[in-house]
Regions:
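A ligand-binding cleft/hinge motif common to bilobed small-molecule-binding domains
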Residues: 47-53, 77-80, 84-104
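Periplasmic-binding protein-like
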Residues: 5-16, 40-42, 101-136, 139-169
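Bilobed "Venus flytrap"/periplasmic-binding protein-like clamshell domains
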Residues: 5-76, 91, 159
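Second-shell loop/turn segments in exported
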Residues: 34-40, 79-83, 122-124, 158-163
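Short beta-strand elements of ligand-binding domains
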Residues: 1-2
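Surface-exposed interaction patches
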Residues: 73, 80-84, 91-92, 122, ...
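Short amphipathic alpha-helices in soluble, non-transmembrane regions
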Residues: 27-29, 135-139
């Protein structure tokens, strides 16, 4: 997904609630940090790598990890003070605030990563070219107007698919 101006991506943020006493990454030591799931980039892999590389912090040794199941649960858990802190994809929080699920004042960001590319869709190399074209056209010619997808993604200022490519080495 991309914004109408062509910008795309999201950042991993580590959030906390205003009463947590946490204002820096180092303040998480000895406390609980919620992750979404072990397979999530922004909900586990990126924060784990950043915490280890930049802060010498490792789960179990320096903080207690918890898995909420998904970004929404982590955000709700932090906002409702069930978790002291959590690692999230910030676009999810933006949409939850826009829907009125939480109030912006319920969470504070103490860390924001570089921008990561959003989810990519692709086709296998040996798929018939005609079918590859049809799949591509389904994405790029999708009529957003009036759909539930438009309603949801415009809250995060997103509203189009963009072409992505890769670098051959």
């Amino acid at each position: 997904m991309a914004a109408l101006d062509g910008s795309f991506g999201y950042e991993m943020e580590i959030i906390t609630h205003p009463d947590s006493g946490i204002s820096t990454i180092e303040d998480i030591r000895g406390k609980q940090l919620a992750f979404s799931s072990p397979t999530s980039n922004s909900g586990f892999k990126a924060p784990s790598a950043i915490l280890k590389a930049d802060y010498d912090m490792v789960a179990e040794r320096d903080f207690e990890p918890a898995f909420s199941g998904k970004h929404d649960n982590t955000i709700l858990g932090v906002a409702n003070k069930d978790y002291m802190a959590g690692a999230i994809a910030n676009k999810v929080a933006v949409r939850m605030i826009a829907r009125g699920v939480i109030k912006k004042e319920q969470i504070i960001s103490i860390f924001k990563s570089q921008t990561f590319p959003t989810t990519g869709y692709g086709v296998v190399h040996n798929l018939k070219p005609e079918l590859q074209t049809k799949i591509r056209n389904a994405f790029f010619n999708f009529n957003w107007e009036g759909t539930s997808l438009q309603k949801e993604f415009e809250k995060g200022n997103e509203g189009q698919f963009i072409e992505m490519t890769y670098l051959s080495l």
